[in-house]
Amino acid sequence: MTEERNNEFRNVVPLQIRFNDVDKFGHVNNTIYFQFYDSGKTDYVSTVCKGFDWDQYAIFVVKIEVEFFAQIKGADRIAVRTRTVHLGNKSFRLEQEIFDIDTQEVKSRCLSILVLYDLEQKQSISFPDEWRQAIRDYDGIL
């Protein structure tokens, strides 16, 4: 599945495939994809939501759907791209893709719903206005 969608995703993170990520069949085990997607989520939040305090806030995944289109081999050069496709009051929906850097082939796609959580108050909270605006500006959400 090859798509020209690069320009729709501003946040792109190259991924390193580790020795233990590859099974005896020579491909990356599908459980590892979730770790790759987490790397993209972490970079996205740190890049877009300036001043995000990981000791004060958490972001919980409340729903996740992953589609697998093609195997990732141990020698592949891959990256994950991330964008917000919907911004609610206390939650947001991310779309992510793992793709081959050389061919642009999309290997997997992930849709997830995440909730902002205040660790001190022990409850979900609304996004601060500055982060809400930063996400809108970064991903072109109206």
Kindly give the residue locations of the regions a language model identified:
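Glycine-rich, flexible loop/turn motifs
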Residues: 15-24, 55, 68, 123
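Residue-level recognition of specific faces of alpha-helices
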Residues: 33-36, 60, 113
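HotDog/MaoC-like acyl-thioester-processing domains
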Residues: 2-13, 68, 73-74, 85-142
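Catalytic strand-loop segment that frames the active site of acyl-thioester-processing enzymes
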Residues: 1-43
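Hydrophobic beta-strand-centered segment that forms part of the acyl-chain substrate-binding groove
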Residues: 44-92, 107
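Generic structural "secondary-structure junction" signal
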Residues: 21-30, 62, 70, 74, ...
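Short, flexible helix/strand-to-coil boundary loops that buttress conserved ligand/catalytic motifs
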Residues: 29, 48-49, 139
